[in-house]
A protein has these predicted regions:
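Mature soluble binding/inhibitory domains
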Residues: 19-523
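Sec-dependent bacterial lipoprotein signal peptides
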Residues: 1-17
Length: 523
């Protein structure tokens, strides 16, 4: 299976968006005049996932932290890099610069000794933002999507990783095959005492208990724990470097057995104890790869106890776009032995095999989800995972889908005869469901980074915007990118989680573009 890395990048960005800003407090409003240099001030943990080119194309994941001084300077930091399984640990960030426009868009340049990397960013608040890697220098050519979250330095102790956590790690196994690894663990003072995981490793399903593991300082860089929240841990036999964001979120990058990255988020006490407590519409998005190529599925369902209804699913499988409306044999279960873990299954469009997913809720409102649909041969039909979130704040309409939004998508694009990664980050003002803004897009080998594309387009909302009427009507979005007089239209199907967050995937019936992403309100 060819891994579609939007499954890795968007998981991180989506879960961050669904689980709030992650700063440990109330998200402050922007300055009355908009964002500025002082909007980025403090330590921020970042993650990106994508590709790099040094003689040949290879997969690349980064996790690290940088410190911004509120005046346009990066004063320090550290990062860990996994390049298709080749790990470089504890790379010092020696300096850098950044700029923030009033709309929250800007750039960050991180200096790594004699070399540098550059990110295009859009702030979603002063606590967090979305980014793409748009490094294009003689020393490095790389792209990828991700995000950054303000850290709480008061949480920089291994003993602070305490309580139940839900995690989602995705990427490559030790043979460079796609892997999705999700689950939960209980930690007491930085020592993992129990847990459970579901792993889809290149189509092979493995589930099991997590027994032991300890969050500790890294002997390679012991001081980085107290300075940056960085350390090492082993989970289910795999080694990771971690970065503490705060007491409720930890970021991870594998340092053995492949290239996995993701977040663990504290699980709260609102998770449903049984299916009788389920009573909501849920939107979800998974992305990854199938036997045909890149894959995205975005959709929604209503859970009323163990009953599942009003199912909508939109699948883009290597350019084959299929819509599922309604379903039979639909049900949802919860695993009493592993709090927050459950499964949902439904059959539609005459499929011989139903769609099946396993999920882990971090609260009653959000969690992570992994596809475990099996083919007729008993192996996975896809390696894909993503986010699941309860729909709130409906009806969605021109009244509440309004204001300033950050925009990010990632996936595959076929341009100039070359298929490789495409990443976009931008900002748009939504007025009467019309879009107006700017964005950077990186079509890797084909066109390189293109800055400051004009963004226009529109959103069409059907019914109350949730899709809970069970009809074939979908919300749609048209995004038009214009640069130097040339315009490109990209059509999407959109599922609103709330007035502040939407999930989308494009509806192309060819392999020229296969992307998925988020629209997140700026605060």
């Amino acid at each position: 299976m060819k891994r579609l890395f939007l499954g890795l990048a968007i998981v991180s960005a989506l879960w961050t968006a669904a689980c709030s800003s992650g700063g440990g407090g109330t998200t402050p409003p922007p300055n009355p005049g908009g964002f500025g240099l002082d909007s980025l001030n403090g330590q921020y943990a970042f993650v990106t996932n994508g590709q790099s080119f040094t003689g040949s194309v290879y997969s690349l994941a980064r996790v690290g932290t940088f410190t911004a001084d509120g005046a346009g300077h990066i004063t320090g930091g550290i990062e860990d890099v996994n390049a298709d399984g080749l790990v470089t640990n504890a790379v010092d960030i020696t300096g850098g610069t950044y700029n923030i426009n009033t709309d929250g868009r800007g750039f960050i340049t991180l200096q790594l000794g004699q070399n540098s990397i550059e990110f295009g960013i859009t702030l979603t608040s002063t606590n967090d933002g979305l980014l793409i890697d748009e490094t294009n220098t003689t020393a490095q050519f790389s792209t990828g999507s991700g995000n950054f979250i303000k850290q709480n330095a008061g949480s920089f102790a291994a003993s602070g990783v305490t309580g139940p956590y839900v995690f989602d790690f995705a990427g490559l196994d030790g043979t460079s095959a796609p892997e999705s690894f999700i689950g939960r663990f209980d930690s007491a003072g930085g020592v993992i005492t129990s847990g459970f995981f579901d792993d889809n490793d290149n189509g092979q399903f493995i589930s099991g208990a997590i027994t032991t593991g300890s969050f500790v300082a890294d002997s390679l860089s012991p001081s980085s724990l107290t300075s940056f929240g960085r350390g090492v841990v082993q989970i289910a036999g795999q080694n990771f470097v971690f970065y503490i964001v705060n007491g409720t979120r930890v970021r991870f990058l594998s340092t053995s057995l492949g290239m996995l990255s993701g977040d663990a988020v504290a699980q709260d006490n609102t998770i449903p104890a049984n299916t009788a407590a389920l009573n909501s519409g849920f939107a979800f998005l998974v992305a990854g790869s199938s036997g045909s190529g890149g894959l995205t599925r975005v959709g929604r369902f209503t859970a009323s106890g163990a009953t599942v209804s009003n199912v909508l699913v939109d699948t883009n499988d290597a350019g084959q776009f299929t819509q599922t409306t309604g379903a039979t044999n639909a049900s949802v279960t919860l695993d009493a032995a592993n709090p927050g873990r459950g499964t949902v299954t439904f059959k539609g469009n005459g499929l011989t095999t139903p769609f099946t997913f396993v999920f882990y809720l971090s609260s009653s409102r959000q969690g992570v989800i992994q596809e475990i649909t099996a083919s007729n041969g008993g192996v996975a039909a896809a390696v894909a995972d993503g986010t699941i979130a309860a729909q709130t704040g409906n009806p969605f309409s021109t009244t509440n889908i309004t204001g300033d939004y950050a925009l990010n998508w990632s996936g595959l694009s076929l341009q100039n005869g070359i298929q490789d990664e495409e990443d976009l980050v931008g900002q748009a003002k939504v007025t009467s469901l019309a879009l107006n803004g700017s964005a950077d897009i990186f079509q890797f080998q084909a066109n390189g980074p293109q800055f400051d594309n004009a963004v226009s387009g529109s959103i069409v909302i059907k019914g109350d915007g949730t899709g809970n009427d069970g009809t074939a009507n979908r919300n749609t979005m048209l995004v038009t990118l214009t640069k130097n007089g040339a315009s490109t239209n990209v059509n999407f199907v959109v599922y609103f989680v709330s007035p502040q967050l939407a999930l989308f995937t494009n509806t192309s019936t060819s392999n020229t573009r296969l992307v998925a992403g988020i629209l997140k309100a700026q605060q």
